[in-house]
Amino acid sequence: MNVLILCTGNSCRSPMAQGFLQSFNENINVYSGGTAPAAQVNAKAVEVMKEVGIDISLHVPTHVNEYLCQEWDYVITVCGGAHKSCPIFTGNVHHHLHIGFD
């Protein structure tokens, strides 16, 4: 199963969601991206995830365009900005979900 999680900066919400989802099932391919990626992952996000035993310190914010041509079982937006401005994934996405953490 391929899952893409999107937010605006790909520095906090989507990498955290990626870390959690990947920790639930290592057989799921989980990726995350942003519509306007930050320069680096948010230090507080790394700290909070470390508290629950999940390491996202090596995450590199990635632009959503890197994933446009791939097939996805789920594309999940986790902030209103990404939900409104993320590109259309016609034909390559089986399910779209919006779970806002604004």
For the regions a protein language model found, what residue spans apply to each?
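Structural signal for conserved beta-strand scaffold positions within catalytic alpha/beta enzyme cores
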Residues: 32, 77, 97-100
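Short, hydrophobic beta-strand segments that form beta-sheet elements in well-ordered domains
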Residues: 73-79
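Alpha-helix C-terminal capping/helix-to-coil transition sites in glycosyltransferase folds
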Residues: 69-71
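Conserved active-site segments centered on acidic
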Residues: 1-65
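Short glycine-rich anion-binding loops that position phosphate/pyrophosphate groups of nucleotides
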Residues: 11, 80-83
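Phosphate-binding/catalytic loops
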Residues: 83-102
